[in-house]
């Protein structure tokens, strides 16, 4: 049987890690005593593989272009170390799933031990900048949800078929995402008790289209939120919003225009 050594996989690929617990977005969940292990892949088709099948309205404004990567992309539109690393990880997923899974499982176990030693809840978000069905994360005929049935997984998604996974796996939680054009699907899911994320340009209202809104900016632990509500998120400026160094207001239905009054 072939042995897969995590350190060698990373060395061969030229990366320091596959995922982690220290991104600014995930660290916010510390406030709810949750340690989250998350994986950031190269979004939509940057890597040559499309990992975001429903991203036509949001790909230009993806959080991939925020934070430290925003600085790198503003210096060089072709990307720097962060984007290159995410591309390598994405290619590994599609081109050598076995290696990817061995490394993923190793890092999940490491992060779980860290959470346990700190007395924290543990959660896993594999689609921080992607929207891949978790049944595709497979090793030895078992997907990641089956390999870790005792652990809490969660994601945001714009893919309606992914919602079907909630009927099969009790350890998976999803928040559906409004893209400006899929309200009929969002309404149906809200009425069934699912949460829906809406990105607002300015302040977070208390109500949107007749549904209560909670402020979801404070943490990423959506699986702890109640169902049937709108999770309001404030838009974060990304590298693609800047032309010749000047900010250009995004023109997309993905971002809900709002004032400081209820919608």
Give the role of each language-model region.
Residues 1-263:
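Class I S-adenosyl-L-methionine
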């Amino acid at each position: 049987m072939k042995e897969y050594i995590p350190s060698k996989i990373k060395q061969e690929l030229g990366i320091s890690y596959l995922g982690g617990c220290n991104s600014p977005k995930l660290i916010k969940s510390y406030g709810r005593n949750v340690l989250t292990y998350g994986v950031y892949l190269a979004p939509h088709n940057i890597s040559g593989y499309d990992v975001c099948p429903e991203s036509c309205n949001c790909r230009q404004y993806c959080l991939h272009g925020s934070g430290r990567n925003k600085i790198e992309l503003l210096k060089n539109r072709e990307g720097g170390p962060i984007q290159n690393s995410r591309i390598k990880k994405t290619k590994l997923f599609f081109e050598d799933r076995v290696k990817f899974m061995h490394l993923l499982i190793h890092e999940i176990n490491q992060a779980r031990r860290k959470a346990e030693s700190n007395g924290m809840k543990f959660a896993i978000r594999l689609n921080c900048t992607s929207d891949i069905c978790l049944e595709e994360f497979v090793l030895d005929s078992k997907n990641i949800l089956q390999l870790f049935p005792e652990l809490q997984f969660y994601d945001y998604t714009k893919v309606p078929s992914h919602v079907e996974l909630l009927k099969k796996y009790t350890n998976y939680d999803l928040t559906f995402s409004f893209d400006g054009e899929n309200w009929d699907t969002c309404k149906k899911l809200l009425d069934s008790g699912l949460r829906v994320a809406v990105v607002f340009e300015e302040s977070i209202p208390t109500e949107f289209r007749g549904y209560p809104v909670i402020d979801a900016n404070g943490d990423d632990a959506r699986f702890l939120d109640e169902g049937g509500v709108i999770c309001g998120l404030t838009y974060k400026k990304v590298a693609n919003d800047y032309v010749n160094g000047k900010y250009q207001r995004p023109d997309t239905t993905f971002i809900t225009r709002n004032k400081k009054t209820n919608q």
